[in-house]
Amino acid sequence: MDIKPEKYKPIKEEYIKSFKDMLLLRRFEEKCGQLYGMGKIGGFCHLYIGQEAVISAVAMIKKKGDSTITSYRDHAHIILAGTEPKYVLAELMGRATGCSKGKGGSMHLFDIPNKFYGGHGIVGAQVPIGTGLAFAEKYNGTNNICFTFLGDGAVNQGQVYEAFNMASLWGLPIVYIIENNEYSMGTSVARSTFMCDLYKKGESFGIRGFQLDGMDFEEMYNGTKQVAEYVRENSFPVILEVKTYRYRGHSMSDPAKYRSKEEVEKYKERDTLVRIREIILDNKYATEADLKAIEQSVREIIKVAVEFSENSPLPAEDELYTEIYV
């Protein structure tokens, strides 16, 4: 297969939805950063600010029944899988009402009814699990596919290549999406892997790969939709490398001194949220007043999430002894 340019273009309603989705993710993550600084969120916390176009496009072309699994930078993925932000924030704040009962925290978010299978703290560990999810779909004879997200740092993990081999050998319906934000913690791609074209990493297993601009919602929408169609129709894996960028450090404890302010500002000039807003206004898909109303509704969602989380109880002590399997 090949990705045809502009085969699919979002319609008016999808542009507006993408703006609302990305704005919600941006404001949610900003609030998480604020609450972390206030000591109300503990442990590790990895923000998704800057990368919103990736999951926004994928979530839009997903079909009911498809599954999602990702790494520890997972807040955005679970929200667009269908989990209400208040349950996600409650989990980050360690409350019993959280999506993982307050025991998972930022890196281990789960929502099985919405087929979101984590949130995994071990680099690359989600890839063989996602491959197993795709195996289950094929075994059960469904027409569902699995979207497995990983970072550029995970592509050097041995288990990733074992998963690639199994997926191609058994013809599994899975899309591996490499979110290449240029740094695995503080190490650039060029310093950690010999072949920097990460979409080619599956070639020895017969897996086609494609590279998309993860800062461009329209390109993400068009490319991901074509790839998903191919995987669904042919039950065979595809690798998507999406070139994106995180505006914040690797985690809340990372000052990101390994990159210059000029580099960060260069990417912010292409901010996907600003671009989508411009497209909507230029094409008269909505008015400035309409977008301000969306902004107000997002503020209300965040406010409700904070109030719900702060008023929720901590887990009962006996929860320490549940869901222990080893």
Swiss-Prot record:
Keyword Zinc carried by entry: no
Required cofactor(s): thiamine diphosphate
UniProt enzyme class: oxidoreductase
Reactions listed under catalytic activity: N(6)-[(R)-lipoyl]-L-lysyl-[protein] + pyruvate + H(+) = N(6)-[(R)-S(8)-acetyldihydrolipoyl]-L-lysyl-[protein] + CO2
A GO MF term: pyruvate dehydrogenase (acetyl-transferring) activity
Gene Ontology biological process: pyruvate decarboxylation to acetyl-CoA
GO CC annotation: intracellular membrane-bounded organelle
Keyword Oxidoreductase: yes
Keywords: Oxidoreductase, Pyruvate, Thiamine pyrophosphate
SUPFAM superfamilies: Thiamin diphosphate-binding fold (THDP-binding)
Pfam family, one: E1_dh
Known EC number: 1.2.4.1
Superkingdom: Bacteria
Binding partners and assembly: Heterodimer of an alpha and a beta chain.
Function as written in the Swiss-Prot or TrEMBL entry: The pyruvate dehydrogenase complex catalyzes the overall conversion of pyruvate to acetyl-CoA and CO(2). It contains multiple copies of three enzymatic components: pyruvate dehydrogenase (E1), dihydrolipoamide acetyltransferase (E2) and lipoamide dehydrogenase (E3).
Protein name according to UniProt: Pyruvate dehydrogenase E1 component subunit alpha
UniProt source species: Rickettsia prowazekii (strain Madrid E)
Gene behind the chain: pdhA
